[in-house]
Amino acid sequence: MNNKNKIYIAGCGGMLGEAFYSVFEKDYDLKCTDIDVNEKWLSSLDFRDYDKYKKDVQEFQPNYLIHLGAHTDLEYCETNQKDAYTTNTLAVENAVYIANELDIPIVYISTAGIFDGRKDTYDDWDQPNPLGHYARSKYAGEVFVEKKCYQHLICRAGWMMGGGPLKDKKFIQKIMSQIKNGKKELFVVNDKLGTPTYTHDFARNVKLLIEKKFWGLYNMVCSGITGRYEVTLELIKVLGKENEIKITPVQSDYWKKEYFAQRPNSERLLNRKLDLRGLNIMRDWRVCLEEYIENYYQGYLG
């Protein structure tokens, strides 16, 4: 007889979903869905369709609902605002309605990008001030979850890394792709500060909070405060290519045609609540970066 608790994970086909499946699947009975069915453990669902989303969750009768999916490309959100708010805000509201009807907790993933970057660091109690439509749509989802769902877990991530070449659409894969394509000089911004977040550490810390039943809002990033430039230097070091590739620091304006969406100068989060509860198991970003490259990029560069 299967006595495992059941978790429904919506939007599970990306870099974060891959980590959540890996971390949770041994101890829980999972149903993982996505609009892009790219794994054998995924089934098809567009969570923007409220009726189908509700029916699918109700039929599974989970103990928890984890809503992962979102549009995270800032430029896409600026130029496709209707889709950005439909996906990042209204679908989250739908998830709250579903969780409340079933009387189960909801887990929502927010972002360090909801702050305006005027401060150097932000803890769990600092007031967000989102700059662009991606940040606004994500923060609107966060506010709704916090106000409308009694048992909620909101976890704010930083610069995500995870999933490897097929699923990582973020900074690490973009740098790795340039290296794979033979670039010998990389132009990297040195005026954007933040905190990397390894998907597997993030999923493990979410699992810990669920099992401890400490609901609420938590910053959840790797330790070690850094910036894009420093992350690239460390990546080149991990790859052993310090003598092969030149890293040239540039200002954000250098990339303004490709990356025109407004971004905060600092997205550095402090895991103050996790620290106070003694539940911060997020490791140093350098340790995680080395593990990530070793586990996901063997043979990638030839």
Model-derived regions: residue spans:
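N-terminal Rossmann NAD(P)H-binding glycine-rich loop of SDR-like oxidoreductase domains
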Residues: 5-27
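Rossmann-fold cofactor-recognition segment
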Residues: 35-49
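NAD(P)H-binding glycine-rich loop region in Rossmannoid oxidoreductase-like domains
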Residues: 47-87
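NAD(P)-cofactor binding segment of oxidoreductase domains
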Residues: 79-107
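Catalytic helix-loop patch of NAD(P)-dependent Rossmann-fold dehydrogenases
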Residues: 86, 90-91, 114-155, 159-161, ...
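NAD(P)-dependent short-chain dehydrogenase/reductase
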Residues: 143-194, 200-208
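Mid/C-terminal beta-alpha module of Rossmann-like enzyme folds, strongest
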Residues: 205, 212-259, 300-301
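Amphipathic terminal alpha-helices
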Residues: 284-302
